[in-house]
Structure formats: C-alpha cells, structure tokens
Amino acid sequence: DGSAMTLSVEPERNDAGVYCIGAWIRDSMAGIGTVTYYDPETRTFGALGHGITDGDTAALMPFGSGAILASTVKAVKKGGTGSAGELRGDFDLSGDVGTLYANTSCGIFGTVTADCPLTCGECVPAAEPKAGPAVIRANVAGDAVEEYTVEILKVLPGAADGREMVLSVTDPALIAATGGIVQGMSGSPILQDGKLVGAVTHVLLSDATKGYGISIGTMLEAGEKT
C-alpha cells in the first residue's frame, strides 16, 4: 500500500561460509503505452486505460514518481493464439515530456511539460459506447497515428479491470501489421460516431483480433479522483 515497513531477516550461510539474504527488489520499470486523451487547458492526460502492474505478482504498483518520454515504434511482434504480441520501440532520452502523478486500475494520469510536442488538433466530445462499428487510433509504426476499424461486440458497464467493452478488430491493415491488438496499444482511443467512447485495454490470448476496452466515462472519473 506504499507505506514503510521494518522487517527482520535471518541470513543463511552459503557454501563459502558467507552469510547472505535473498532480496527481491524492484525500483523502476518502463514500457510503451498510448495516450488516450489530453486536456490542453489543464495540460493533464490519461493513458493506458488500466494500471501498471508488477509482471510477477500482477499487483498494482505504487510509485514515488514517474516520467513520460516520446517514443518511436521500430518493430512489431505479432500476436498469435496463446501469445500476446507487442510494439517495440526506442525512447527519446533527450528529456522528459511529462510527469505521472497517479497509477490506478483505470489508467495512469499525469501532466505534460510546457514544451511537450503533444498537440490537440481537434476537440472530440465524450460519449457512452454502444454495440456497433467504431474506430481506434493507434501508432504501430514510427510515430504516425492511423485510424483502424473495429467492432464493439458487447458493452459491459461497470465491469472491473478495464473490461467494459468487448472489441473485435476488423481492419485488414491492422491485422496484417500486428495480428490484432498487441501490448503497447493499451490506451488507444476508441471513437464512435465522431465521439470518444473509451480506450483499448486488453487482448484475448486465444484470439489476438479480439480484446477489451474501458469506457471514457470510467477513465475520466478515475482521473478526477486522483
């Protein structure tokens, strides 16, 4: 829960006669994800649509501080049956473009710097998702954001862990490029009838063309509580 703890450990002597303790410590982590929305008035953003969790325990990771950097997608490991694909890229280490202040089960939230290259070319109203055709905006090559068609198969309001929509990728170009939904696409905005309705969050391991999404209402509510 982020609180300090004091523990007593009894060391064990190894074969060389040296006393040792076993310690499992994780002090940082990094990865590629997608910004879902940005408010130019407050310079705040929401991303991922789910929390950053420990890869070994699946627990939501507390953090003291976090930073965001620009990245470029260099390669894609395609998703397949039983195996999640991923976007692979390089970070721009010339400087941070923002800071994180919250890691929640509904996404990560932060602010961008004054000189951040992130721009708001259009303001899109928010709306509730409904079953039917939709599009997602994703960056799966270089730094270009493209629009791809998907189908919202089912809406599950209030479902836990960012699984409020069941999605099916229908765009042949995206399926050819990535196999469907891959790691790194989390946070990709879902638009329906020109309105922002949510973000991509998870992929089905049994079928990479299908996955889940969180509603934008749930994500915005989580951001307001941080």
Name these PLM-found stretches.
Residues 1-226:
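C-terminal recognition in membrane/secretory proteostasis and scaffolding
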